[in-house]
Amino acid sequence: MVCVVVSTFDQIKPTKINLSLFGRFERGAGMDKAELRRAVIARRDALDLDMRAAKSAAVCARLVELLGGSGPVAPRAVAVYAAMGSEADPAAFAAAAAKHGWRVAYPCMFSAADTVACGQRMCMRAVAAGDASEAPFIAHPTRAFAATDVDSSRFPIVPAEALDMIVVPLVAFDHTGARLGYGGGCYDRYLPTLSPACQIIGIAFDEQRVD
């Protein structure tokens, strides 16, 4: 199952998308990708804090529903992200997943040397519920870390093929489910390495929809 969870003020609407569309987004309204990113981020930034919090809470509630419907198989692992700026915030979902006994992982950017060595720009590291404030890659999600900079015994890498669900950030999406990211290509490289059974879920507000 692959879907985008979209929040409106009073409802949640899941939209099926095609994984092959990730990383490919048609130009919208005569804009190039950079212009489109700026325009959509500005629209998202314009949401006041209370509205953004309400929308994020609604998104997380829908994610918890998906979590509950994923079956009793254990152990399970889910990757989320640490929200930056005005992004939809999956923190409440991450807490709920941990309470359900799921292993929760966060993106950790690789150093240039490690990127060359493994062919990926990021990995997912497991973080126990009480350790989130101590994880440097959560505090600084865009910073690159050498393997020796992170305590791998405390924050072990979760192999991509071991993930059962991944929650993906995005800038914009359209009615076909195509996703526009931030332009770094990290998820474009990472997502194809996941198990075919992994649920890939992009979360956004309806203000980020571009048709």
Task: Name these PLM-found stretches.
Residues N18, G30-A162:
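N-terminal active-site beta-alpha-beta segment that forms phosphate/nucleotide-binding
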Residues R24-R27:
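Basic polycationic patches enriched in arginine
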Residues M84-S86, V171-H175:
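Short glycine-rich anion-binding loops that position phosphate/pyrophosphate groups of nucleotides
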Residues V80, V168-P169:
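Redox-cofactor binding/interface segments in oxidoreductases and associated redox assembly factors
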Residues P14-N18, G30-E35, A42-D45, L49, ...:
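Surface-exposed, charge/polar-rich loops and edge strands
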